[in-house]
């Protein structure tokens, strides 16, 4: 991350609660370390040092410090954990507000696990730490001296979310995990030794002006007094600029990092045959690594927080998961449900907000956590395993649609669609249950006469804006365009609305993307089946047109001449009300494009469907496909 490189310019004299139960005043001393060893020049920046009372011991000036700092045990990482691709990870909805408001991208990085239910609450791990949403009544020990998972955690009063840096737990355990890369010469056990109180340094002494060439600046953070004088730690200016940047520490460096617990410790790490020189420094709420072999966008050495999230999981293993059978959960994005975790065969493909039910058992694999789940739709049900990282136990907002592949509705229908390849696409919206089923939903297809629907809606929106109803001639054009699919009538109305630009403006105004009107021929406009379903959904839900014009549009689409009905119209269940429009035309390649779209209502059940085909040798081939898909959906959803 790029940060501005600046010296501290303000005196901060707020009280700070120390890790050993004493209040330390924080004083900053800017020092210049010259090329002569141990010779420095001090420049106090108007700071005030607050008294520490009786803390004067010379070797370990702060007795009662974290007892684990003097420990000798080490912990060898045994859990195999692979960090997922950031594109496949999601910040759980329960943490999104905190993550956005608290600079989560900088302070925490990407999610590397899902938010999982534990004994104490919901826990999600990130690149640089973790977030905890405690259960009511849970006892959470945030004291830095605890050396546990929650040590040095920072609670947000607005959301009750606790940010966990994890570094304290890794230091306390003496994790043998390498710091700053798999081949690093430094481990957390080494950092623990470097963080002991006897590593505090005295305030650097003054040297003559003759040694003032080629200085490198440091900031001295005062911790207290010993018999040798003021003691604390030196922070290199590059690291100081990083931790004090508003991007890195939106709540201020004292809150987001706290005082240093060590000096900046040199290390090396080999990457792709190149030796990288590192500086690692421990703070109360984070560990910072400067890699002098990499640069940021300003060309300066790259500085980041340490990847404590993955290091914690590899050292301690995953947290104990507490999932109750029959607990509802929802998909966060596209993911499969497999027969077995990791390597199983896909059973269904689910998408955002798709509802699932936990079976109660879980499985940790190298790729992460998997939940055993079951699903049920109008046409299918089953059980399998889904990656927990792509799920949430937080219900989506009311009215949010759910998404899935056709295999979640009917494996047989999904298999049929797959056999048609990329020249076929289908989208169904089960309005009654708020569920989309899709196959090749974003493919672009020639609209043919289905373009007459957006022409009609654009025209009626225009007359509404003009404060009038269609005149007799316009009503004739509308009727023959929709009911008889008359192309001359469609051309007349297309010209009257202003052609392709006007239709594009209408579609943009109602938020429908994916339909591209063709200025040279409306019939060769293109659409995605999803866009067509979304446009029909807006008509069905009254999001376009006033009530009178909406009734007119439905009346026209419900009275299509029999010779213009196939697909939706030919296969609708008995007693269904169908508002529809089909289309077919030879494409530029002289192969047929054919489609069928409509709104079908049977009693209390309503679904909206669009099936598009193209590059078919015979028109009958397109008819057969639309009949098969529309008929199968009608049997499943009506």
Regions flagged by a language model, labelled:
Residues 399-433, 437, 492-638:
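Penicillin-recognizing serine hydrolase domain
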Residues 34-335, 360-365, 381-388:
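Extended, compositionally biased repeat/scaffold regions that form elongated interaction surfaces
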């Amino acid at each position: 991350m790029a940060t501005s490189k600046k010296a501290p310019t303000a005196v901060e004299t707020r009280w700070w609660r120390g890790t050993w139960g004493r209040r330390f005043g924080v004083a900053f001393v800017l020092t210049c370390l010259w090329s002569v060893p141990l010779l420095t020049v001090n420049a106090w920046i108007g700071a005030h040092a607050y008294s520490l009372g009786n803390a004067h011991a010379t070797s370990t000036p702060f007795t009662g410090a974290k007892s684990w700092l003097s420990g000798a045990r080490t912990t060898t990482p045994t859990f195999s954990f692979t960090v997922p691709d950031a594109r496949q990870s999601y910040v759980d909805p329960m943490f999104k507000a905190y993550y956005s408001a608290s600079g989560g991208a900088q302070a925490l990085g990407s999610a590397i696990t899902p938010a999982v239910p534990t004994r104490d609450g919901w826990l999600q791990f990130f690149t640089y730490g973790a977030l905890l949403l405690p259960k009511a009544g849970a006892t959470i020990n945030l004291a830095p001296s605890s050396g546990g998972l929650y040590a040095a955690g920072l609670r947000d009063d607005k959301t009750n979310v606790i940010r966990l840096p994890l570094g304290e737990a890794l230091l306390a355990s003496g994790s043998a995990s390498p710091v700053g890369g798999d081949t690093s010469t430094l481990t957390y056990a080494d950092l623990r030794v470097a963080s002991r109180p006897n590593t505090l340094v005295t305030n650097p002494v003054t040297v003559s002006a003759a040694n003032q060439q080629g200085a490198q600046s440091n900031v001295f953070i005062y911790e207290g007094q010993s018999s040798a004088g003021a003691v604390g730690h030196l922070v290199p200016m590059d690291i100081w600029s990083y931790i004090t940047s508003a991007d890195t520490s939106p709540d201020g460096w004292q809150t987001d990092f706290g005082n240093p617990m060590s000096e900046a410790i040199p290390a090396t790490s080999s990457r792709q045959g190149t030796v990288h020189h590192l500086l690692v420094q421990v703070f109360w709420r984070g560990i910072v690594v400067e890699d002098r072999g990499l640069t940021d966008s300003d060309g300066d050495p790259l500085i980041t927080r340490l990847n404590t999230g993955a290091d914690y999981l590899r050292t301690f293993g995953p947290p104990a998961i507490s999932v109750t059978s029959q607990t509802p959960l929802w998909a966060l994005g596209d993911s499969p449900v497999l027969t077995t975790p990791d390597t199983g065969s896909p059973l269904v493909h689910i998408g955002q907000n798709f509802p699932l039910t936990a079976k109660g058992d879980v499985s940790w694999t190298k790729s992460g956590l998997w939940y055993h789940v079951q699903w049920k739709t109008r046409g299918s049900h089953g059980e399998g395993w889904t990656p927990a990282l792509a799920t949430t136990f937080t219900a989506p907002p009311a009215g949010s649609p759910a998404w899935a592949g056709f295999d979640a509705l009917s494996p047989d229908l999904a298999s049929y669609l797959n056999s048609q390849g990329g020249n076929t696409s289908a989208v169904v919206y089960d309005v009654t249950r708020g569920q989309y089923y899709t196959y090749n939903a974003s493919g672009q297809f020639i609209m043919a006469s289905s373009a007459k629907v957006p022409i009609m809606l654009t025209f009626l929106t225009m007359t509404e804006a003009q404060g009038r109803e269609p005149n007799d001639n316009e009503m004739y054009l509308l009727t023959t365009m929709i009911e008889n699919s008359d192309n001359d009538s469609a051309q007349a109305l297309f010209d009257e609305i202003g052609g392709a630009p006007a239709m594009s403006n209408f579609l943009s105004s109602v938020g429908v993307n994916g339909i591209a009107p063709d200025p040279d021929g409306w019939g060769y406009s293109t659409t995605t089946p999803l866009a067509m379903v979304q446009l029909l959904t807006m008509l069905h839900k009254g999001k376009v047109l006033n009530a009178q014009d909406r009734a007119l549009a439905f009346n026209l689409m419900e009275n299509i001449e029999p010779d213009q009905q196939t697909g939706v119209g030919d296969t609708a269940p008995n007693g269904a009300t169908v508002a529809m429009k089909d289309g077919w035309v030879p494409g530029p390649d002289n192969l047929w494009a054919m489609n069928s779209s409509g709104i079908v209502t049977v009693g209390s059940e309503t679904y909206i469907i669009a099936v598009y085909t193209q590059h078919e040798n015979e028109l009958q081939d397109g008819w057969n496909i639309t009949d098969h898909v529309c008929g199968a959906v009608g049997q499943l959803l009506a």
